[in-house]
Amino acid sequence: MPELPEVETVRRGLETLVLGQEIVAVTLKVPKMVKTDLETFALTLPGQIIQSVGRRGKYLLIDLGQLVLVSHLRMEGKYLLFPDEVPDNKHFHVFFELKNGSTLVYQDVRKFGTFDLIAKSQLSAFFAKRKLGPEPKKETFKLKTFEAALLSSQKPIKPHLLDQTLVAGLGNIYVDEVLWAAKVHPETASSRLNKAEIKRLHDETIRILALGIEKGGSTVRTYRNALGADGTMQDYLQVYGQTGKPCPRCGQAIVKLKVGGRGTHICPKCQKKRL
């Protein structure tokens, strides 16, 4: 699943490709992807001009002025821009024809991606309803708020970080990286974390997601950015996908286990499980 660094990289690519373009026609082949009114989606988008492309957590925000098209890539969604003819592909599901003759295509092998067309004035309420946490930046991701939320919960720390309420944008790859960097076992109850561990989790979340953005995201399975290029963050992953390899910190073999139903990579020496 594209996580915050991948979505931010897609955002930057889209802004380069389609900023200022007018949508002249929309073709939707998988109606279930649109979570707001289908007729409004089909009739309102033509004539709209893409004024900016933003992001909130893992959501892309295509700013159309008074309206915002909120796009979530889910597991394998991606955008491609074709300057003229669009090739046949059974995984192309949404087609945005632009005034300059190009077509922005949404591709999704698993058809899990979603679109919500909402008034810009409703954007805050949209994310509040989903209890989306702050962006992972020093200015918005406050240590004391993070600490209070952790200490009041019995949830294991990995599922807690994944649920998007503590901080927006973490997925399976980057949670494993953050937990390893902070020397925290993924099954540790949130309330049992000490202040030093909480600070490390906070600081490493900011650092690692920023690094992921800098490296253009992780191409682990099928991720490509909007320009069709791979990311390079996979070359900097310390534990995710490194089963059997030596821990970069202590040399112990990385192991893979299941936490909350998710494949999880840890160093059993650096990330000791509490009894």
UniProtKB/Swiss-Prot annotation:
Gene: mutM
InterPro entries with a match to the protein in the record: DNA_glyclase/AP_lyase_DNA-bd (IPR015886), DNA_glyclase_Znf_dom_DNA_BS (IPR015887), Formamido-pyr_DNA_Glyclase (IPR020629), FPG_cat (IPR012319), MutM-like_N-ter (IPR035937), Ribosomal_uS13-like_H2TH (IPR010979), Znf_DNA_glyclase/AP_lyase (IPR000214), Znf_FPG/IleRS (IPR010663)
GO MF, one example: zinc ion binding
Enzyme Commission no: 3.2.2.23, 4.2.99.18
PROSITE patterns in the cross-refs: FPG_CAT, ZF_FPG_1, ZF_FPG_2
Binding residue positions for DNA: 91, 110
Similarity-based family: Belongs to the FPG family.
Zinc finger residue ranges, FPG-type: 238-272
Annotated cofactor note: Binds 1 zinc ion per subunit.
Protein name (database record): Formamidopyrimidine-DNA glycosylase
Domain of life: Bacteria
GO biological process: base-excision repair
Catalytic activity of the protein: Hydrolysis of DNA containing ring-opened 7-methylguanine residues, releasing 2,6-diamino-4-hydroxy-5-(N-methyl)formamidopyrimidine; 2'-deoxyribonucleotide-(2'-deoxyribose 5'-phosphate)-2'-deoxyribonucleotide-DNA = a 3'-end 2'-deoxyribonucleotide-(2,3-dehydro-2,3-deoxyribose 5'-phosphate)-DNA + a 5'-end 5'-phospho-2'-deoxyribonucleoside-DNA + H(+)
SUPFAM superfamilies according to UniProt: Glucocorticoid receptor-like (DNA-binding domain), N-terminal domain of MutM-like DNA repair proteins, S13-like H2TH domain
Signal peptide: none
PANTHER family: FORMAMIDOPYRIMIDINE-DNA GLYCOSYLASE
Presence of keyword DNA damage: yes
